């Protein structure tokens, strides 16, 4: 087909769609996101068993999350830059495979040091997948990018929520212990095979070079830096709760299985919030959605920690929807602030969220060791509080990219 992008994802001359998004491309990208984040999301469910096996302190538990988050975050902008300059659709199947294989290795590692190695490689797989995946999710979304990105993001949300349940099924329900963690790799390997066949179709959505150059002139680094500060502070709540909910429920006298179910509730609520947040942002504006979520999050978190019981679980559900549900909104905003560097914007937005979340996990682990887990969880509410002021200062984006390109006819792919 004349003008079609190469399978490597190089920009080409392609036709435009009007308003909709390509369901075939989105299904492939969201499935890969689900499998990648399922592997990453399984780690907290394994932490109580790793803690018991290697007699870990809370700080050492937090260090595992730090390794996972740093390895999956620091290198993301580099992958995004590679994507913007040369195209790197091959990162999609490679990343999702490595994410699962790393966790599988960590679950059967004979020492704490080798657990760290497995977690490290899993994080690199996560880092490889996200910039390219979110970049092409934007391309296949048409003009409703927040809505489209919410569908891509909800794949990750569901993966995070399924991760603890899948790991617990093999580790606890089937009584396999940590050896059951090897099965976490299976979804990623299956989805990687599907992504290999989807690459030519996805490549047809890459924008023309002329459009990329025009968009680069509108890059807003000031707005980007302010948004990244918001993303980092939001991670204090997101990753802090994500890491310590299971351990907090155990400290309350509940079992490990119950703690895993509470974590799944938090994450599934985030998936629902994502599905609502994207379309709502397209309708009423990105900043209004961010601001509303940051206003309601602190009291909801405090209610979960201080009240507990059914009321606490309901509060945690809505906290998950508010905190996690704005992820797709901030991701689209980062791409709108850097329209000529969509891969870099995606890598910075996702990478910083993960990386600072790891620092938050380690810091909150130290607070839990020095004081208690309740105090550490209450500290997670501070991030959204600061985000309220920063959100009010966010500028409007100067550039709006045209609706994404139309895919080639099936016979030409």
Where on the chain are the PLM-derived regions?
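Extracytoplasmic gate region of multi-pass secondary transporters
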Residues: 43-44, 222-271
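Structural signature of the two symmetry-related core transmembrane helices
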Residues: 90-104, 288-303
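Helix-loop-helix hairpin linking two adjacent transmembrane segments in secondary transporters
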Residues: 152-200
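Cytoplasmic helix-loop-helix junction between adjacent transmembrane helices
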Residues: 118-155
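Helix-breaking motifs and short loop linkers at transmembrane-helix boundaries and internal kinks
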Residues: 55, 87, 108-113, 142, ...
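Conserved MFS/SLC helix-loop-helix module at the cytosolic interface between two early adjacent transmembrane helices
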Residues: 74-113
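Residue-level signature of mid-helix packing/kink "hotspots" within the transmembrane helices
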Residues: 41, 69-77, 161, 267-275, ...
